[in-house]
């Protein structure tokens, strides 16, 4: 079993694998293996969620039995500095538009803000067949906004691929924590 003893230096990514929202599946289809990212600092999970915006949660309230989790570490992380930045943004809304200058933060945007080691990349919204999938066309139609295709942004899979991170554990279940 994995322990929480080295979590203060853990940069955590998680992969949905099973039961997940349509948005989560669309993110994974467009960008890679992951659909969400969070960070564990001093016993708490910090992340930006579509339901609550930027929050700090107890691990028991965060981990879900129908998800698999991969753990990453950034060995050079200044925990105190990252925690100060993480706390500064608590209560910010979720950036549902994924626009670079949208109000609030989406999950990987929040991570890149509090741990500024990641570059932005052109955002993708395709599904392997179309440059913009039907899901994202409808999503942005409902928002009344154009799809921000190729706008600068981040995504969880891109963050996980950073050469600055080390993968510590893969395919962990909620019961492993």
Language-model regions, residue ranges each:
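Activation targets extended, charge/polar-rich intrinsically disordered C-terminal tails
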Residues: 97-177
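Exposed alpha-helical structural elements
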Residues: 6, 81-85, 131, 135
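Short coil/turn linker and secondary-structure boundary residues
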Residues: 74-77, 154
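Stable alpha-helical elements in mature extracytoplasmic
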Residues: 78, 82-86, 103, 107-110
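Sec-exported extracytoplasmic/periplasmic mature domains
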Residues: 87, 91, 116-119
